[in-house]
UniProtKB/Swiss-Prot annotation:
Keywords, sorted A to Z: Methyltransferase, S-adenosyl-L-methionine, Transferase, tRNA processing
Name assigned to this protein: tRNA/tmRNA (uracil-C(5))-methyltransferase
Active-site residues annotated for this sequence: C323, E357
InterPro entries according to UniProt: MeTrfase_TrmA_AS, MeTrfase_TrmA_CS, SAM-dependent_MTases_sf, TrmA_MeTrfase, U5_MeTrfase_fam
Gene from which this protein is expressed: trmA
Amino acid sequence: MNLAAMDPTTYDVQLEAKCVKLKQLFADFDTPELETFSSEPAHYRMRAEFRVWHEGEDLYYYMFDKELNSKVRCDQFLPASELINKMMPALVELLKPNTILRHRLFQIDFLSTLSGEILVSLLYHKQLDSEWEQQAKILKQTLSTQFNVNLIGRARKQKIIFDKDFVVESLNVAGKQLQYHQIENSFTQPNGKVSVKMLEWAIDITKNSSGDLLELYCGNGNFSIALAQNFERVLATELAKPSVESAQYNIKVNQVENLQIIRMSAEDFTEAMAKKRSFRRLEGIDLDSYNCNTIFVDPPRAGLDADTVKLVQGYERIVYISCNPNTLIDNLAELSKTHKITRFALFDQFPYTDHMESGVFLEKK
């Protein structure tokens, strides 16, 4: 991470440079005008991870700066939410004099929400015993006088929870309040306010849809739950068990009645749709009963494999959210043969980095 680049006064210039670069990357495609969704210039990250440095009686957070090729002390961290920045000094001042809690502590992770919850994970190079548990309970109680906080202790093959290992985010999305269960150590959108903009963009481009929606790589149901209002039914797949459990929680708490989550990979689902294989996880689910005219994909950085690209091409409308414009371009080389890009967006999830989160909406030619 290049900490020196994190200067809010240069944010607009850096964002404009990303827009120019993204347009250049997509120059070979017939794209509409780029829609740009900016981030807050500071305190935009809802999660952060720090290593812990021990120096005599002192103890502090640090990160590794790739530009300087050295560790940098982080008493505060500009990208992190205001809640994380408030927690950082409060926590470290309680850890410093506590020989039990600080011993062999090497990392601290924070997961916060816009709605005011924070989860703190303490990672150790030692086994956690009853003495540690007693001190951790006191730490949690003390922090709870100032914060809506939960605490986790982690060591090799150990995970001790006080009192929850998740937070519940509450987001106002297009005038509707949505709640999202976000579990520790699993994927969540890092930039809460930009995540809302992504959801609202996806709702807008699918608002006149008919039939059903298929989503691959649905995670904790982030998009499926928000988009369910635009479709008769939604069928979504996700492989990671914690994410599927979070998605089921989110379906229930948001009272979404037309969304079905299947725990399987996109690759396996592609084979199931092509009737190449049968899967026990699909027992009781009649895939042929779904009338999915729209497909939503938010794949990992590697993009879609060739078979999944062929599957996706079978749908009238494609919503593709990408965390890697290069693999999106690779996929568009095929998708653009059958579909036309009608919406094109940049979501600045990660200010002050080269990372570009983009979205395209494609409709069959």
